[in-house]
Amino acid sequence: AMLAKRKDVTDKGWCDKLSTKLKTAKTQHSHELPNYWLAIGDSHTAAYSRMDSGVTKRDGMTLNGQCRSGFDYIKTILAEKEKRDREYDGYSSLEGITMSFGNIDIRHHICRLNTDFKPLLYQWRQFGESLGIDVEYSAPWPIEYEKRKPPKTGYYKGEPFWGSYNERSEIVSEWISEMKSLGMKLVMPPADWYNINPEKYAKEYMEANSSVHLSPAKYRRKDWGKSALGIFE
């Protein structure tokens, strides 16, 4: 199995069991699944998604870009889902969404442009409130070890990040504080993650290939690393 070749996968036997199980799996189409909740956003979206949530993402998306477009991407996805729901079920089944934005803004743009991010958060909340459904908002991840070498796909203008570890960590803290003051319903990892040694965080909580993403073993749907997958139980 290709999954067994990943450095962060230690149980190769589990991968073999998964391959065997997939051979007998029944194919289902998305409209057959009870997607009452949908996670939408950037490349970090899956990590913030709740159990049984549908996930749709577009890599490289920023909160700033969404604010400037009037959240066209989100509107398009929601309109497409409602159309499918009504076509197959006769009604819209969506109860709420989780939106994932902001990590890329903090990594590459806030310090580089020395810009005020608070208006972005206000616009984000205003848009969420306009939807008329339950809405969750992603809180930014802790800042990882500065010497970590992400792949070039994670660079912007030739740099892996803009701003020092301390500068970006301060922005993360202020960002979360502002979200709370705006009454936004946050999806965020345990508070102690933000006090972990950044090198330890990068090695034990992020993907082993030095990417900018969280390890799947630490996703929200895994209770931030406390739960096993349990696919063979």
Model-inferred region functions:
Residues 36-122:
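Conserved SGNH/GDSL esterase-like catalytic core that processes O-acyl groups on lipids
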Residues 220:
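Short, contiguous, pocket-lining structural segments
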Residues 85-213, 225, 230-233:
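Alpha-helical cap/lid subdomain in secreted, periplasmic
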Residues 215-217:
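Short, conserved phosphate/pyrophosphate- and ester-handling motifs at nucleotide-, phospho-/glycolipid
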Residues 1-56, 153-155:
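N-terminal secretory targeting modules
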Residues 18-23, 53, 78-90, 223-233:
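Short amphipathic alpha-helical segments
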